[in-house]
């Protein structure tokens, strides 16, 4: 029994010791109270940390707590004494004085006298004026040092905060190109209330409290807010929304309140919250209760920014996001984020302005055609154009290194590769050492270790060809987001299909190029076009040509890629496509294999597929505005598409892309063989009217030309490849290769029509069913 009682006492002492050590560490870090604490304070602390200690009798608990406090005090004494011993020993080593060594004992005596005061019940009862003075002076000095430390810390924090609230000075609105409409709207909504609040007070108009900037990544939301702050010259609070989130309960809401309180104290003030969707998601879909509390705190703080609560000094909030639909709906109502400004993917004219603005700080050489460069950068946002400029600069530097230090001026004898050449070998005047760019740059750095002089820097400049080469190295962010760059297919790449070209020009291309003409006759809603017909007849090629001709943003969607096995994800993907298109209008959406997305709704169709059909129907002709968004769909099974897709207002124009006739086959062959060298004996007119081409589609004719070219290449170059004689093969490759009639005859044996007579009759019956559409197309 005695052993068990001893072990219990040790366990109790160990528990209390752990709790009091944590209390001591906390006090030393925060300095909110003095150490050592009283026995009563220690008992209160350990009972709060461990509920089981409340069941122990008070005398026993007091005895153990006092014992642990004495132990901790002794540890502090030893550390203090050892630190002072070290200080005195170091000073003695420097002075080499024996008299100073005796001061260690006196210091220890003083330490003991001071630490003995800790166990006394009341400092006032201690005798000795010297001890009182020493203790009082030490406590006063310690508290003064702590106050001084706190004041210095707080002062440095305040100075840092004040420095961060200055508006950025490295960018202005004149440095931004292609966003003229957005800048004018921001000046109206933000600059006017901040600069002239008296106008709103006099007229009794409530100015907007918040403006939401949304658009694809890299379009300039953050840069626009920084430039506006510099233009206004008012205190600017810029915060990243994820930095508000804290792991401690209540800390996130506290940070939100502190930021808004600081903004009101600095009023007139402009606040910018980047990636605001990270902290204000929809409350019904929030994963944690903390997210709901943060949203509620944001709503409350936004309501407190009225003129009445800010003493007539305006505080405006600008939020930025690329996912506006994920924000809580209460945050987007009037009185909070009153206005929303959409920064779209820049058009060709906007890209030209952006490039001209970026070129102001560059050293360019030659005649730059910014208009042509803007045409070659469809889908590029401001960040992509900046990356393009940087890539062009790197290419220019590599080129200039080669020009400044040509290979014949470098010390070629130092290259070890020359030592490996045989003595009887010599380089001709036209020969050069095959060095790569890395070796050129390395040799240049070795030859010029010092900074270049102004005379050497003079030839450094970026030429137009550097930008052309950089286009292949920079991928637009919109392409990673689901956009496709404008295809390099024009009407010249398409043979025949002239009647369908005219219909597509009237339905898609001209409304984008000349919208005022259509508005003058009352046509405002965009048209949807359904291209249907046998496979391989050029439906996808037509859509690419339309996108290229209109110079609009282009989104290519293959029907099955939007389908998802999770509930609601397919519908969300459909909505996201139209959301991106509306943000980048004018935009052409091309749905390939539409029958996979919108099959006919009946009892056999699953509920998930029905929801996808309903979502697409409402996006095409629902409550949401579809201005500037044009839809082209392609299918070879129009009979299984839901009939509601084909009513007016959706895909109301159906165009049959049928198999080409004899005359159209000749035109297609002429287009396909522009890059193929043909023998004089080849007659494309006879070839296109051959009976064996009766059911050939455009894709079949392309396969025929490709197979004939491969046959000619095999007979001219690779005839001896099986015998493993590369020298003969290399010699044969130097001879001109031309495709002959014999090559086409061999190709006819391998290429068969992809559409049978039975399939063609089926499409003819479908064309009769839609007689009105097919008759117009046939004309």
Swiss-Prot record:
Pfam families: AAA, AAA_lid_3. PROSITE patterns: AAA. One of its GO terms (molecular function) is ATP hydrolysis activity. It is found in: Nucleus. GO terms for cellular component: nucleolus; nucleus. Residues 144-158 have a biased composition (Basic residues). ATP binds at residues 215-222, 533-540. Keywords: ATP-binding, Nucleotide-binding, Nucleus, Phosphoprotein, Repeat. The keyword Phosphoprotein applies. Residues 125-174, 759-779 are annotated as: Disordered. Belongs to the AAA ATPase family. This is Uncharacterized AAA domain-containing protein C16E9.10c.
């Amino acid at each position: 029994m005695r052993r068990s009682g001893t072990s219990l006492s040790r366990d109790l002492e160990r528990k209390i010791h752990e709790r009091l050590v944590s209390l001591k560490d906390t006090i030393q870090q925060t300095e909110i109270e003095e150490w050592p604490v009283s026995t009563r304070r220690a008992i209160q602390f350990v009972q709060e940390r461990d509920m089981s200690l409340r069941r122990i009798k008070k005398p026993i608990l007091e005895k153990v707590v006092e014992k642990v406090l004495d132990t901790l005090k002794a540890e502090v004494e030893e550390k203090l004494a050892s630190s002072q011993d070290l200080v005195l020993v170091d000073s003695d080593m420097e002075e080499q004085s024996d008299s100073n060594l005796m001061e260690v004992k006196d210091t220890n005596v003083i330490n003991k006298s001071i630490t003995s005061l800790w166990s006394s019940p009341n400092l006032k009862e201690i005798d000795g004026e010297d001890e009182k003075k020493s203790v009082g002076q030490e406590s006063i000095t310690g508290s003064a040092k702590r106050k001084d430390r706190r004041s210095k810390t707080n002062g440095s924090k305040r100075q840092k905060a004040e420095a961060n609230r200055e508006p950025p000075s490295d960018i202005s609105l004149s440095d931004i190109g292609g966003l003229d409409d957005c800048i004018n709207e921001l000046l109206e909504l933000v600059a006017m209330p901040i600069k002239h609040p008296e106008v709103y007070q006099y007229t009794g108009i409530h100015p907007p409290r918040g403006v939401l900037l949304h658009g694809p990544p890299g379009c300039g939301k953050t840069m626009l807010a920084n430039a506006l702050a510099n233009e206004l010259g008012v205190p600017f609070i810029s915060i990243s929304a994820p930095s508000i989130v804290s792991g401690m309960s209540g800390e996130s809401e506290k940070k939100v309140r502190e930021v808004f309180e600081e903004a009101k104290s600095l009023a007139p003030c402009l606040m910018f919250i980047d990636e605001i969707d990270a902290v204000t998601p929809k409350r019904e879909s929030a994963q944690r209760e903390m997210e709901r509390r943060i949203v509620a705190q944001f709503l409350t703080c936004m309501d407190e920014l009225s003129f009445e609560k800010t003493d007539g000094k305006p505080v405006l909030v600008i939020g930025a996001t690329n996912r506006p639909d994920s924000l809580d709906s209460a945050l987007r109502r009037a009185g909070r984020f009153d206005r929303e400004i959409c920064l779209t993917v820049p058009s060709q004219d906007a890209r030209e302005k952006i490039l001209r603005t970026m070129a102001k700080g560059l050293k360019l050489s030659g005649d730059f055609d910014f208009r042509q460069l803007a045409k070659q950068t469809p889908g590029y946002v401001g960040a992509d154009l900046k990356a393009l400029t940087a890539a062009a600069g790197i290419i220019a530097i590599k080129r200039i290194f080669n020009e400044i230090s040509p290979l014949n001026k470098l010390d070629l004898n130092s290259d070890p590769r020359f030592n490996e050449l045989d003595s009887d070998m010599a380089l001709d005047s036209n020969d050069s050492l095959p060095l790569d760019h890395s070796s050129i740059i390395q040799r240049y750095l070795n030859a010029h270790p010092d900074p270049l002089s102004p005379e050497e820097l003079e030839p450094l400049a970026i030429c137009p060809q550097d930008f052309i080469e950089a286009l292949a190295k920079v991928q637009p962010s919109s392409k990673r987001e689901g956009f496709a760059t404008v295809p390099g297919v024009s009407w010249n790449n398409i043979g025949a299909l002239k009647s369908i070209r005219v219909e597509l020009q009237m339905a898609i291309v001209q409304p984008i190029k000349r919208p005022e003409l259509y508005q003058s006759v009352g046509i405002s809603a965009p048209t949807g076009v359904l291209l249907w017909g046998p496979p391989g007849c050029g439906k996808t090629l037509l859509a690419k040509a339309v996108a290229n001709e209109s110079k609009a943003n282009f989104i290519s969607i293959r029907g099955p890629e939007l389908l998802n096995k999770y509930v609601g994800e397919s519908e969300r993907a459909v909505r996201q496509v139209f959301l991106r298109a509306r943000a980048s209008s004018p935009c052409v959406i091309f749905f390939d294999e539409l029958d996979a997305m919108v099959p006919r709704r009946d009892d056999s169709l699953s509920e998930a597929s029905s929801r996808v059909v309903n979502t697409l129907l409402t996006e095409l002709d629902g409550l949401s505005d579809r201005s500037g968004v044009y839809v082209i769909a392609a299918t070879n099974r129009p009979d299984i598409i839901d009939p509601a897709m084909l009513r007016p207002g959706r895909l109301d124009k159906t165009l049959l892309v049928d198999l080409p006739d004899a005359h159209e086959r000749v035109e297609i062959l002429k287009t396909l063989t522009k890059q193929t060298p043909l023998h004089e004996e080849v007659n494309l007119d006879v070839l296109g009217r051959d009976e064996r081409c009766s059911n050939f589609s455009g894709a079949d004719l392309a396969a025929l030309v490709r197979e004939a070219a491969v046959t000619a290449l095999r007979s001219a170059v690779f005839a001896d490849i099986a015998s493993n004689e590369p020298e003969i093969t290399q010699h044969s490759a130097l001879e001109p290769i031309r495709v002959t009639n014999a090559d086409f005859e061999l190709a006819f044996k391998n290429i068969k029509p992809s559409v049978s007579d039975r399939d063609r009759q089926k499409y003819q019956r479908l064309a009769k069913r839609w007689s009105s559409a097919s008759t117009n197309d046939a004309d």
